[in-house]
UniProtKB/Swiss-Prot annotation:
<dbReference type="Pfam" id="PF07478">
    <property type="entry name" value="Dala_Dala_lig_C"/>
</dbReference>
<keyword id="KW-0479">Metal-binding</keyword>
<feature type="binding site">
    <location>
        <position position="302"/>
    </location>
    <ligand>
        <name>Mg(2+) 2</name>
    </ligand>
</feature>
<comment type="function">
    <text>Cell wall formation.</text>
</comment>
<keyword id="KW-0573">Peptidoglycan synthesis</keyword>
<comment type="similarity">
    <text>Belongs to the D-alanine--D-alanine ligase family.</text>
</comment>
<dbReference type="InterPro" id="IPR011761">
    <property type="entry name" value="ATP-grasp"/>
</dbReference>
<dbReference type="InterPro" id="IPR013815">
    <property type="entry name" value="ATP_grasp_subdomain_1"/>
</dbReference>
<feature type="binding site">
    <location>
        <position position="288"/>
    </location>
    <ligand>
        <name>Mg(2+) 1</name>
    </ligand>
</feature>
<feature type="binding site">
    <location>
        <position position="300"/>
    </location>
    <ligand>
        <name>Mg(2+) 1</name>
    </ligand>
</feature>
<dbReference type="InterPro" id="IPR000291">
    <property type="entry name" value="D-Ala_lig_Van_CS"/>
</dbReference>
<dbReference type="GO" id="GO:0005737">
    <property type="term" value="C:cytoplasm"/>
</dbReference>
<comment type="pathway">
    <text>Cell wall biogenesis; peptidoglycan biosynthesis.</text>
</comment>
<keyword id="KW-0961">Cell wall biogenesis/degradation</keyword>
<keyword id="KW-0547">Nucleotide-binding</keyword>
<keyword id="KW-0963">Cytoplasm</keyword>
<keyword id="KW-0067">ATP-binding</keyword>
Amino acid sequence: MEFCVLFGGASFEHEISIVSAIALKGVLKDRIKYFIFLDENHHFYLIEASNMHSKYFAQIKEKKLPPLILTHKGLLKNSFLGAKIIELPLVINLVHGGDGEDGKLASLLEFYRIAFIGPRIEASVLSYNKYLTKLYAKDLGIKTLDHVLLNEKNRANAMDLINFNFPFIIKPNSAGSSLGVSVVKEEKELNYALDSAFEYSKEVLIEPFIQGVKEYNLAGCKIKKDFCFSYVEEPNKQEFLDFKQKYLDFSRTKAPKANLSNALEEQLKENFKKLYNDLFDGAIIRCDFFVIENEVYLNEINPIPGSLANYLFDDFKTTLENLAQSLPKTPKIQIKNSYLLQIQKNK
């Protein structure tokens, strides 16, 4: 089976997406037929596999290529010889952050009826917004940390709204890769941390920061009616992974398995199933959990994990190919114009 990797995007995580695509190339190799790069101006470019390396993008060489136009059948390439349609195999949405995870690309691909692996519109909206993710989890009976949502209007009252003690962690409500994330240990650090977070999002989420909390990551997808899980990873970190650590982490080929009981692993999987069903059909996602006093809490849902979290799967290629055979289908609406014909008939 052949794939097309779509990456880049007008996002703070633009470079993360490039690194992610380069890493996935090393995993899937010649199964990737096309690499389609989306730049910050929403132009599409076809990138040769031989140019899929950091130096090429650092020098912005893709700007010398002719831009492509997305159509119902694939990508339209104009040249002096005339227009040519590049028919796309199954697309892997690997655009992190804005465009890829907020639902824009899902909307576009669904609109043009282009088959893709990735979160659909509703799944993107709920998982990209951390506050909405918490509401979604609560509705499913899954615990989340206490939290306060701030915007520019109420940020001046932050200390009155926060009902938990220092230290706490401040995050942009709609951003990933630890962009704009700070641990605040005393009040004098608050304004700077808020300024940093508001650079990336119009809203900011504040949660208690628990030093040394047990964290477990689990990736997976649903293939037909059965779930396919990765093994559970326990991130090796001190306070939290910053942007640079996550950025470099995508190149890894394997992650150490977590040492946890069968009972806890089953709990994580059951929570994953609740979160996935049926909202995330067609996507490989990663759920990050905390375990506090033997209780499982959802930290966040990553709808497009770095390099699709391939390093957590024992057989990623088979998982991807099986998922490709189990994608959700949007029913085609039949337009019969019967109402209009009836109006015409009655005239």
